[in-house]
Design a protein with these regions (language model features):
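Catalytic centers of hydrolytic enzymes
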Residues: 42-45, 54-57, 73-76, 183-203, ...
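Surface-exposed, short loops/turns at beta-strand junctions within beta-sandwich domains
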Residues: 2-8
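Acidic, metal/ion-coordinating pockets
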Residues: 36-316, 360-372, 434, 451-453, ...
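Short coil/turn segments at beta-strand junctions that form active-site/ligand-binding loops
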Residues: 7, 79-81, 225, 379, ...
Length: 556
């Protein structure tokens, strides 16, 4: 194979404006050596996806069938082509995947012919027994280099590994995988637990350099010509127009040749310490096409280029027939049920942004859902975590068969809501619960909720109270005031109140570890409660109103 000729790589670093919207800014260039003729050079192509979240249908994205066909076309240009994911393939998914135990997504990934994936935090949305099922059905290799044990992920036939190698056309590429160390806080407690030889264990996920560097040494010892790190971490802020965050830290410190990120759902590519670092946004809206020139005699990467591929510049616009049939078969199982209209809303509530709106301040859907559950259970207050809001409402990623429904914000409302929208915005199957809390615990809960601003999903959407947070202050000291609806201050003391929240939050998810779980009263599935409220409004001839009303004040 001839040497790969590469143009200088122009890469994009995203900055964040005051509204949390990213835009291209300064670039950095990695230049390929002009001429190397004596070494055995090989051209390697990598196709990378991340945070797919079971987006099997082509709603403002590729969809599984079109991704499959494009990946197939891409591979025709290079015999040394590898297809990889940086995690969150499943979990927080539309109903077509979530209502079918996520199996359709694994089947779709098999159809797309993935080689390797790391676990993301959402792979652990359900327990390890479920994840073992996903591994069992996977025709690709899962890797996890920063887990203390992989015994809980051994199916007997397929199993996760700390590293893997894949060889094609005389090039052996090594892969390691790093999941975010914050996973335990972002999932239901107990989802990392397993039994082995009659004893109870729990997977520990860390950013341990010892574990990760051991995997890098091992994959090199296994003969890898180049090493790719699949990392389920992203970037979360910028300083002077340059992205910062865990992904960037890893890229600067790891002794690897290529780094792919994920988790923060933001397009990014740059060069750090000579290492190309790239990630794409979520839900199959785009993928990375990376070309690498590697010297297989010296195991040296001589140059690399990266291009983000969207539906507008993709090589194929024809869907893969087999994957399309599989997706349609699963869709037909649930379509009639999920397309039932349950209400109308006055606005399309937003999601996302470089600083996701649902994770960084007051949100209209968050306000409404907190109000609904507080009223239903008659509690003093309610708290809904922003990370549980997974889509716009109506959901842009769910497409009913009835095209006469008003769905898009470019149309004039009110906007029609079907069951599929509710299961898309709340896909986890959490259970609303009631608990008794003290004023001290309430303050601690809100402090935790604003502690990672503008990152993370723990931002608290509340009902029955108002609060002010000064996010310029140190963590643990950001809540300025909490009042009830009459304006009376909520003191940081032992006075007790009733609070509605999800079982996920009550049991310590997203760092909410201040509650006494023994006092928890489990009630109803989150989606079912919201469906009931929507239907009640529709029966009364009302459009459900969602709005911002100033219950949350953020000092920046």
């Amino acid at each position: 194979m001839p040497a790969l000729s590469l143009d200088p790589m122009t890469v994009t670093v995203q900055a964040v404006n005051e509204y949390g919207i990213s835009a291209p800014v300064a670039t950095e260039t990695l230049v390929t050596p002009a001429s190397v003729t004596s070494a055995p050079l090989k051209s390697v192509q990598l196709l990378q996806l991340s945070d797919f979240h079971g987006q099997l249908e082509p709603n403002r994205s590729f969809g599984a069938a079109l991704l499959a066909s494009n990946f197939a076309v891409e591979r025709l240009s290079n015999d040394a082509a590898f297809t990889v994911s940086s995690g969150d393939n499943i979990g927080a998914a539309p109903p077509i995947s979530s209502q079918n135990a996520e199996l359709p997504t694994i089947k779709a990934m098999n159809g797309m012919k993935f080689d390797v994936s790391v676990f993301g935090n959402h792979e652990h949305d359900r327990n390890l027994a479920h994840l073992r099922q996903m591994i069992r059905y996977s025709e690709f290799q899962w890797v996890a280099s920063n887990y203390n044990s992989l015994r809980g992920l051994d199916t007997g036939t397929n199993r996760a590994k700390t590293f893997t190698t894949v060889e094609r056309d005389g090039v052996k590429v090594g892969f390691i995988g790093i999941n975010t160390k914050d996973t335990p806080e972002q999932i239901t407690p107990g989802n990392l637990d397993f039994n082995y030889a009659g004893k109870a264990y729990s997977i520990n996920i860390s950013d341990s350099e010892t574990r990760i560097n051991r995997a890098i040494r091992d994959v090199k010892a296994a003969g890898a010509d180049m090493v790719v790190a699949l990392i389920h971490e992203g970037w979360n802020a910028n300083t002077g127009g340059e992205a910062v965050g865990p992904l960037i830290d890893y890229a600067k410190s790891l002794d690897v040749d290529l780094v792919y990120g994920a988790h923060s759902h933001q397009t990014y590519s740059s060069v750090h310490e000579g290492t190309l670092t790239a990630m794409v946004s979520n839900a199959g809206a785009e993928y990375n096409r990376t070309q690498v020139c590697v010297n297989t005699a010296t195991n040296t990467v001589l140059g690399a280029s990266n291009e983000v591929i969207t539906t507008s510049n993709a090589p194929s616009n024809t869907a893969d027939a087999d994957v399309a049939t599989m997706v349609n078969d699963y869709k037909s199982k649930n379509q009639a049920k999920l397309d039932v209209k349950v209400g109308q809303v006055n606005i399309v509530t937003p999601i996302g942004g470089t600083t996701p709106v649902q994770r960084s301040g007051e949100h209209a859907f968050g306000n409404w859902s907190a109000d609904v559950v507080r009223a239903k259970y008659g509690t003093d207050f309610a708290l809904v975590n922003g990370g549980g809001i997974r889509s716009t409402f109506p959901a842009s990623t769910y497409e009913p068969a009835d095209k006469t429904l008003v769905r898009d914000e470019t149309e004039t409302g009110p906007y029609d809501i079907v069951l599929g929208d509710v299961y898309t915005i709340h896909p986890f199957g959490s259970v609303f619960s009631v608990i008794e809390v003290t004023g001290t615990q309430l303050w601690a809960a809100l402090e935790n909720g604003v502690s990672e601003y503008p990152n993370n999903g723990r931002w608290p959407h509340v009902s029955g109270m108002k609060f002010t947070a000064d996010v310029t202050k140190a963590k643990g000291s950001r809540i300025v005031s909490i009042t009830d609806l009459s304006g009376a201050a909520i003191a940081k003391d032992s006075k007790t109140y009733t609070l509605t929240l999800t079982d996920f939050v009550a049991k310590g998810g997203d760092g909410y570890n201040m509650f006494d779980v023994a006092k928890l009263q489990v009630r109803d599935l989150d989606a079912e409660v919201l469906i009931e409220a929507l239907r009640a409004d529709m029966a009364a001839g009302k459009v459900t109103e969602m709005k911002l009303d100033g219950r949350t004040t953020v000092i920046k």
